[in-house]
UniProtKB/Swiss-Prot annotation:
TM region(s), chain numbering: none
Name assigned to this protein: Arginine kinase 1
GO molecular function, one term: creatine kinase activity
Family as reported in the entry's similarity comment: Belongs to the ATP:guanido phosphotransferase family.
Keywords: ATP-binding, Kinase, Nucleotide-binding, Transferase
Length: 356
């Protein structure tokens, strides 16, 4: 049963959202009918309610999406809301569709997107993973956070070769270490208001940590937005090298930590925008000519399913004509195909910038 106080909060939040001019996918798909159908449902294991799913979007009317999954079962229990949002965001991934089996393809296919080193400042490929047997952020206890951190820390300490490095827990971190990680742009902060409203930041900084290799080209975030964010990056445009490093790491970690996977949705994550491959392949790129013609930039981006963000990521501006550009689609295609969309799109953008 859903608590009366929760229901009251839902009704009030829904009324405000319905009356707002919010452009979020939540507002678009949370019709009165869907709302009434879901407001009394709870997930079987962790007893998550519709409020847990939508409260970030209820509080932040400027959300792009506005919903999160408090636990894996939420994707099924609240499917009437998740499915249309997933379909809208992931370019027509319908509720009858099934995400393909994981396939990283031939890692030697990709070369350098910018061999002359004129446009691409840095390249990064990341994926998200959830550990089997644990819910997502809002349902985790402090003990679970700590237990997960120790599992992750011991798993990563077994990595060798290029991936060998050190794990830094956020709890009790020395000031000098903290400053170094900030300078390297590695340190994640307590979540923004979108994550705060989704209850993704409880017991902070318990159970949170950062691992990086000695060369600072491989990074793992433990219990930021997802249980694990696995990141490979470096200066320049050598996507091939960066992708290969990521794939090696994911395969190594998966041998030791079982990941949550769903036959239909692929790898499960806290935010529905990251489902499926969970892959986000991005570049920081200077395209001053295209930057002065934003419409053209957006047009090419749309054609190749690319997402254009400001220099410092979501909800930021482009500084000095530098954009963060990545693949937008993560579902209904393989990991290899997701990275290839970005590779082809960036290649095209550079060609266009040169011709202007």
């Amino acid at each position: 049963m859903v608590d009366a106080a929760v229901l009251a909060k839902l009704e009030e939040g829904y009324a405000k959202l319905a009356a707002s001019d919010s452009k979020s996918l939540l507002k678009k798909y949370l019709t009165k009918e869907v709302f009434d159908n879901l407001k009394n449902k709870v997930t079987p294991t962790f007893k998550s309610t519709l409020l847990d799913v939508i409260q970030s979007g209820l509080e932040n009317h400027d959300s792009g999406v506005g919903i999160y999954a408090p636990d894996a079962e939420a994707y099924t229990v609240f499917a009437d809301l998740f499915d249309p949002i997933i379909e809208d965001y992931h370019g027509g991934f319908k509720k009858t569709d099934k995400h393909p089996a994981s396939n990283f393809g031939d890692v030697s296919t990709f070369g350098n997107v910018d061999p002359t080193n004129e446009y691409v400042i840095s390249t990064r490929v990341r994926c998200g993973r959830s550990m089997q047997g644990y819910p997502f952020n809002p349902c985790l206890t402090e003990a679970q956070y700590k237990e997960m951190e120790s599992k992750v820390s011991s798993t990563l300490s077994g990595l060798e070769g290029e991936l060998k490095g050190k794990f830094y827990p956020l709890t009790g971190m020395e000031k000098a270490v903290q400053q170094q990680l900030i300078d390297d742009h590695f340190l994640f902060k307590e979540g923004d208001r979108f994550l705060q409203a989704a209850n993704a930041c409880r017991f902070w900084p318990s159970g949170r940590g950062i691992y990086h290799n000695d060369a600072k080209t491989f990074l793992v975030w433990c219990n930021e937005e997802d249980h694990l964010r696995i990141i490979s990056m470096q200066q320049g445009g050598d996507l091939g090298q960066i992708y290969k490093r990521l794939v090696t790491a994911v395969n190594e970690i998966e041998k030791r930590v079982p990941f949550s996977h769903d036959d239909r949705l692929g790898f499960l994550t806290f935010c529905p925008t990251n489902l499926g491959t969970t892959i986000r392949a991005s570049v920081h790129i200077k395209v001053p000519k295209l930057a002065s013609n934003k419409a053209k930039l957006e047009e090419v981006a749309a054609k190749y399913n690319l997402q254009v963000r400001g220099t410092r990521g979501e909800h930021t501006e482009a500084e000095g004509g530098v954009y963060d550009i990545s693949n937008k689609r993560r579902m209904g295609l393989t990991e290899f195909e997701a990275v290839k969309e970005m590779y082809d799109g960036i290649t095209e953008l550079i060609k266009l910038e040169k011709s202007l």
